[in-house]
Regions:
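Catalytic-core regions of core metabolic enzymes
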Residues: 1-740
């Protein structure tokens, strides 16, 4: 389909915002939302007329809107859910009936709303907090602007699923997000109870267009109902109408976006709930819009200095003890153990000449001559209380290209937020200068292991986590907001050998988006795995842009987001000072950008290992052949080829493959026990050679794209023990499966 030809009158929409702002409002009334829609290219906003409180409309005015019935809606700056308080009435289109209902609403709605607030005081608008009884009802009554008379347009169907919600929302992390799905008063229930992506879908407006979003929307129950694809249902809207609607909302979102430096206003929220459908017309039945003034864009960080952070030629440290094993001393020893030249390391330590063979100087002003007054990387391992003054000194002396802030106590708690804000303000100020100053990793950062940079600043002793030192690493990076998460992945799965392991900590300066963009352009990395707890303002959007760029460049991006539940969000806030956003939005945006999103820690770990080891393999398709010596596992393989996130097919064998497998089974005397199937259960009696030859036959089949082999480690016929005195069970035996 070609892009919709839309005529959006941005000047008229901006004037609506100007008028509301001049009246001290940050929202549009419902009738103003209908005006906005009419200026956005929408075909059928209903006719509406505001009956101001205290006015005396004539019969002619009340009858000016056509139809058999009239819809009356209360208009108030504080009442959002009008139906619950009797704020919506449908009456016969007769002047007296309209007057009666209108007058009744002006008295009944304040009473109903006051009663509702007294039942749910925590949900009360700020204007009504602490009020009750007649005082509360009077305050609500004073805020009523009047009643809106709206054209009644009966829907084609009132069946479940025949109403559509379309909304824009400005999110802190991902900017403007468009969502659409099952509309009506039970929208929240649908989103909560239906499977992911069935009730509501969402996308970043900067990373999609009308047609792309429509492709996503087609997967929902809402589309199947609207398009007449369910039993007893007929189509009530065209695909072209939906695409045009989505495209209009996307363009408005990107115009009134915090990412647009020329935006006159920012749309905080624009929602139509619901659109109903009458004779192939999309009719908005309710709408709301909130807006704000534009804000100053964040100062860009000198992210090119990440290269100095990851590949430093010189390193400085502060916080190294000469007499005991503290974090700083452990970091020093790990740096040297990874192979970094000690003559290119300097310690800030007054009263000492050398610690572990590394030179000490009394202050940052005394850096060795060959360092020219500045190091590529400066590691801060002192207490959080010392950090603000130290950051000032580093910046004033231009003493480092990059800084690693190890200490916590920099924003994780209320008590430490003032200290963190002080440091952030100082860093942002230097970033605004021509030089830009250093970049800062952390705070609350476990450090970095950079195999190409030949250094390790993790504060974990070698005795606790022995590492395979040297150049045996893969073209992968693990970026984690939690150092402990990264530590446990490497401890549980030592087969993981990424070139870089980076603990981001609190993102005081450098962000997840910055780091992903760096590795997107890195020639040393093909696989990027990210554990996130929360994004800085707008950084989720930057992250997704970098994900898309990386994937289009042929790289794999793996992602796990913590803080999926209210309890999880609370836990992450206390961990690394992250602000957990809405998981559904995060999941949608990151997936649509092209990342592989893991559901569990174990799945993340497994996917990372697969991506590390198989990235350079060519996978032609999703036709799978599987073999196992355990029957339950073969069944489990068949049960696991589909999920909400992926779909594979069990391959059909070519005749030559069937013949080869049958001949092998006869040779191994398994033909009476094993049949040719996919997945193939070859019985615990199958030895290592049988497993290997079955897999080889499957791999040669032109109908097979990948082979999955399950090994039964307890089978007496298999070599599966790493340490044993019995050669028949030894993993490294030449006849075993491992050497094959």
């Amino acid at each position: 389909m070609s892009a919709p030809q839309l005529a959006i009158d941005y000047e008229a929409i901006t004037e609506l915002f100007h008028t509301a702002h001049a009246e001290g409002r940050n929202f549009l009334y419902e009738y103003e939302v209908y005006t906005l829609l009419s200026r956005s290219g929408a075909e059928t906003p209903p006719r509406a007329n505001l009956i101001p409180r205290g006015s005396r409309p004539s019969d002619e005015e009340l009858m000016a809107i056509p139809g058999d019935k009239a819809v009356l809606k209360i208009v108030s700056p504080t009442i959002v859910h009008k139906t619950e308080v009797g704020g919506v009435r449908i009456v016969d289109r007769e002047p007296d009936r309209i007057r009666s209902a209108w007058r009744r609403m002006l008295y009944e709605v304040p009473e109903n709303y006051a009663a509702w607030i007294e039942r749910y005081p925590d949900a009360a608008p700020a204007e009504y907090r602490g009020l009750s009884g007649e005082v509360l009802a009077d305050a609500i009554s004073r805020d009523l602007k009047g009643v809106l008379q709206v054209q009644f347009m009966p829907p084609d169907s009132s069946a479940f699923g025949n109403e559509l919600i379309v909304g824009l929302r400005r999110t802190r992390e991902f900017g403007m997000v468009l969502s659409a799905g099952l509309g009506g008063t039970d929208t929240e229930l649908y989103a909560e109870r239906f499977r992911k992506g069935q009730a509501i879908v969402a996308a970043s407006t900067e990373l999609t267009d009308g047609e792309t979003f429509f492709s996503l929307f087609r997967q929902t129950i809402s589309y199947r109902k609207l398009a007449g694809l369910t039993r007893g249902q007929r189509r009530i809207v065209t695909d072209e109408q939906l695409i045009e609607c989505f495209e209009s909302f996307i363009r408005m979102a990107n115009h009134y976006s915090p990412a647009n430096p020329d935006a006159p206003f920012i749309i905080e929220e624009l929602e139509i709930n619901p659109f109903a459908f009458t004779d192939f017309l999309m009719v908005p039945l309710d709408g709301m819009c909130r807006f704000s003034l534009p804000e100053q864009l964040a100062v860009p960080r000198p992210v090119h200095r990440i290269d100095a952070l990851l590949h430093p030629k010189t390193i400085g440290l502060i916080g190294v003890s000469a007499s005991r094993e503290n974090f700083g001393r452990t970091i020093l020893r790990n740096i040297l153990a990874e192979g970094f030249a000690p003559e290119n390391v300097v310690i800030i330590r007054e009263g000492e000449d050398f610690i572990d063979g590394v030179a000490c100087v009394p202050s940052l002003r005394d850096l060795p001559a060959h360092m020219n007054g500045s190091v590529d990387l400066f590691v801060v391992a002192v207490s959080a209380r010392q950090v603000p003054d130290l950051v000032d000194e580093i910046i004033d002396l231009n003493a480092a290209a990059s800084v690693m802030l190890i200490p916590g106590g920099m924003g994780e708690t209320e008590e430490s937020r003032t200290r963190a804000e002080q440091v952030i303000a100082r860093i942002n100020a230097v970033h605004a200068t021509e030089h830009g100053g250093p970049v800062f990793l952390g705070a609350n950062c476990m450090g970095v292991v950079s195999r190409p940079g030949k250094y390790d600043t993790w504060f974990i002793p070698e005795e606790k986590l022995p590492k395979e030192r040297g150049g045996n690493y893969r073209r992968a990076a693990l970026v984690s907001q939690s150092g402990a998460f990264m530590l446990h992945r490497i401890s549980q799965c030592p087969e993981l050998r990424p070139a870089y392991m980076i603990s981001m900590g609190n993102q005081t300066d450098l962000t997840l988006g910055d780091m992903l963009r760096y590795f997107t352009h890195s020639d040393a990395v093909d696989v990027i795995a990210v554990y996130a707890e929360g994004f800085n303002d707008q950084d989720g959007l930057e992250f997704c842009r970098a994900v898309r760029e990386a994937v289009l460049a042929g790289k794999e991006v793996l992602f796990y987001k913590a803080g999926r539940t209210p309890e999880g969000k609370s836990a992450t806030s206390g961990h690394t000072a992250s602000l957990a956003g809405d998981f559904m939005v995060c999941d949608s945006c990151v997936r649509q950008a092209g990342a592989i999103v893991a559901r569990t820690f174990t799945q993340f770990q497994d996917l990372f290992l697969l991506a590390e080891t198989l990235h350079d393999k060519t996978i032609r398709g999703n036709r799978l052949a599987a073999v196992s010596g355990a029957g339950f596992e073969a069944v489990g393989m068949a049960d696991s080829i589909h999920s909400d996130d992926y779909a594979m097919r069990l391959a059909g064998y070519a005749p030559a493959t069937r013949e080869a497998l049958q001949a092998l089974l006869r040779e191994k005397r398994l033909d009476a026990l094993v049949g040719i199937a996919n997945p193939m259960d070859i019985n615990p009696a199958a030895d290592d050679e049988t497993h290997a030859r079955v897999a080889a036959s499957m791999l040669q089949d032109p109908n097979v794209d990948a082979v999955l082999v399950g090994l039964d480690p307890l089978s007496p016929a298999m070599h599966t023990l790493a340490q044993t005195a019995t050669p028949a069970y030894a993993l490294d035996d030449p006849q075993g499966i491992a050497p094959r």
